[in-house]
Amino acid sequence: MCCTKSLLLAALMSVLLLHLCGESEAASNFDCCLGYTDRILHPKFIVGFTRQLANEGCDINAIIFHTKKKLSVCANPKQTWVKYIVRLLSKKVKNM
């Protein structure tokens, strides 16, 4: 009888723990860039971008480029090549 109660209590605690972990994970589905790439990306590999702003929950401003291979690459928005690609992609969207 004692073992059954302990087993039931352990099972209930496990279910509760899994439920709580699932909720906290869903609430934080946004990843922040912590640094920038050292490489210059070619525009032909980039399909889109997202702006990350430091005042919206992340530590640094960044441009997150989305590649054809479904990778996310963090880039410094102050660099010339980053500004060029953002301008290029923005023009493509306007012309659609």
Curated annotation (Swiss-Prot):
The keyword Disulfide bond applies. Pfam families: IL8. Residues 1-26 form the signal peptide. GO terms for molecular function: CCR6 chemokine receptor binding; chemokine activity. This is C-C motif chemokine 20. C-terminal processed forms which lack 1, 3 or 6 amino acids are produced by proteolytic cleavage after secretion from peripheral blood monocytes. It is found in: Secreted. Expressed in the seminal plasma, endometrial fluid and follicular fluid (at protein level). Expressed predominantly in the liver, lymph nodes, appendix, peripheral blood lymphocytes, and fetal lung. Low levels seen in thymus, prostate, testis, small intestine and colon. Belongs to the intercrine beta (chemokine CC) family. Induction: By bacterial lipopolysaccharides (LPS), TNF and IFNG/IFN-gamma. Induced by phorbol myristate acetate (PMA) in U-937 cell line and bowes melanoma. Repressed by IL10/interleukin-10. GO terms for cellular component: extracellular region; extracellular space. Acts as a ligand for C-C chemokine receptor CCR6. Signals through binding and activation of CCR6 and induces a strong chemotactic response and mobilization of intracellular calcium ions. The ligand-receptor pair CCL20-CCR6 is responsible for the chemotaxis of dendritic cells (DC), effector/memory T-cells and B-cells and plays an important role at skin and mucosal surfaces under homeostatic and inflammatory conditions, as well as in pathology, including cancer and various autoimmune diseases. GO terms for biological process: calcium-mediated signaling; cell chemotaxis; cell-cell signaling; chemotaxis; defense response to bacterium; immune response; inflammatory response; positive regulation of T cell migration. Its main location: secreted. It comes from Homo sapiens (Human). InterPro entries: Chemokine_b/g/d, Chemokine_CC_CS, Chemokine_CC_DCCL, Chemokine_IL8-like_dom, Interleukin_8-like_sf. The keyword Disulfide bond applies. The gene is CCL20. Disulfide bonds join C32-C58, C33-C74. Keywords: Antibiotic, Antimicrobial, Chemotaxis, Cytokine, Disulfide bond, Inflammatory response, Secreted, Signal. SMART domains: SCY (SM00199).
